């Protein structure tokens, strides 16, 4: 598993690059890894997805 700091760097870069669609992009990457049978890589993408959600903050209505 990649270091926590590296996961957060990737999450921040994805959030800056993809904005509102960053969470969906990370989830799509996780599903692609799962479909290939790469559970460890999928777990890292899920972790990145969670970090992006924290950066994004709560939804406002």
Question: Could you say what each language-model-derived stretch is?
Answer:
Residues 1-28, 32, 36, 40-43, ...:
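Long, non-catalytic architectural segments outside compact domain cores
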